[in-house]
Amino acid sequence: MIERTFVGENVSETLIDEYFKTKLVRAGYSHIDLKKTPIGTRITVFAEKPGFVIGRKGKMVKELTETLSTEYAVNNPQIEVKQVESPDLDPAIVGHKIASSLERGMHFRKTAHSAIRRVMGSGAKGVSIIVSGKLSGERSRTEKFMDGYMKHCGEPAEALVNKSHQLAKLKLGVVGVTVKIMKPDVSLPDEITILSGEIKEVTEYSEASQE
């Protein structure tokens, strides 16, 4: 019974996160922190632009609160909004900006290089951007861009690297954007991957995606 409750809560939080992700596009939405209290449910929304989450005269936050209560069965939702202090070190925000640029017709290489410069310029120890899908033709491929230090697998990768996955809807199809960032304040273990100061690109083609 406890396991079912735990799984149910995780599913609900995931659904709420997806709802906020689509509803708060202009706010630079990052993530939520959901905690149950004796008097209800406290939901902290982290975003680049808190004003867009609140809305004019609190209209948006009221709409969010009502939707959480009626459509997601959240008990007495109390929404708190916090600003992301370093948006260029937040993988969700960085990934969303890349996806938005791709949807506006920007070239994926130029967009990825620009994002990497912003991330590293904000003091990150390392960054990895993976763009996957039909980028410029009928054949799907994966492009990888990296700079700085990055741990790709194992427990250190889980503990030290923040990761986010976003989607861009293009004319040729949906493109996935994965961003990994190692922030300035992490303590690096001895086993690390050292990359050169230049951004590297790796192309991988998927034969199964040909149509």
Curated annotation (Swiss-Prot):
The keyword NADP does not apply. It holds the Pfam family Ribosomal_S3_C. InterPro entries: KH_dom (IPR004087), KH_dom-like_a/b (IPR015946), KH_dom_type_2 (IPR004044), KH_sf_prok-type (IPR009019), Ribosomal_S3_C_sf (IPR036419), Ribosomal_uS3_arc (IPR027488), Ribosomal_uS3_C (IPR001351), Ribosomal_uS3_CS (IPR018280). Disulfide bonds: none annotated. SMART domains: KH. Residues 16-85 form the KH type-2 domain. GO terms for cellular component: cytosolic small ribosomal subunit. GO terms for biological process: translation. One of its GO terms (molecular function) is structural constituent of ribosome. Keywords: Ribonucleoprotein, Ribosomal protein, RNA-binding, rRNA-binding. It comes from the Archaea. Binds the lower part of the 30S subunit head. Belongs to the universal ribosomal protein uS3 family. Part of the 30S ribosomal subunit. This is Small ribosomal subunit protein uS3. It comes from Methanococcus maripaludis (strain C7 / ATCC BAA-1331). The lineage of its organism: Archaea, Methanobacteriati, Methanobacteriota, Methanomada group, Methanococci.
